[in-house]
């Protein structure tokens, strides 16, 4: 089978990279155990984070940062604030990908266990990521963070789930800003159709597209866009992941 043809559309002459010039204060805790197993899955829909290309450098975001799933896939560099805590490991920082939601806990005060309650900016990091910047026994530390471009290996991936008249497509391993803002789908016998966000980075179509090859347009929150032609062949199957040869 011929490799899919990929068209890259640059909407701006100088593509904007999602980089924050200034550091922003927040706090950070950890979850998921020393092997990070408890961080697999999550509210972004990426499933096994190793298979999805994200690994253990991941974090759940408080709702103030998560934005109902719109920030899934964003990358942040996080540094422990040594000016406020002796539990920090000086001179260290780590870049993580947002893969989950840290839900509010309104039974606790925001400064006494309800770390993810709005309007707090908080990262609940995988334990391996967290202990690279702070001492395990601390439990919670003050940090500074900034959003940075995502560096991913290989192409954008699409997992097609669902059933007839309901395609649920997970878009992942996305570079650049990392944050998918819009997805469109095209069957070989249809025009382009906008997909709607179902949850996290799962995008929904209600068209009947069986026996048609499928193409996708992926637009990031910085307005950059790629078109991936015929990534899924006409005999595609639900439950299958298709990997493109392009990324941002």
UniProtKB/Swiss-Prot annotation:
Xref: Gene3D superfamilies: Expansin, cellulose-binding-like domain, RlpA-like domain
Signal peptide: 1-21
Annotated GO biological process: plant-type cell wall loosening
Pfam families: DPBB_1, Expansin_C
Domain Expansin-like CBD: 165-244
Compartments reported by the entry: Secreted, Cell wall; Membrane
PROSITE patterns membership: EXPANSIN_CBD (PS50843), EXPANSIN_EG45 (PS50842)
SUPFAM superfamilies: Barwin-like endoglucanases (SSF50685), PHL pollen allergen (SSF49590)
UniProt KW Cell wall biogenesis/degradation keyword: yes
Domain Expansin-like EG45 residues, every copy: 41-155
Family: Belongs to the expansin family. Expansin A subfamily.
Name by which UniProt lists this protein: Expansin-A33
Organism of provenance: Oryza sativa subsp. japonica
Primary gene name: EXPA33
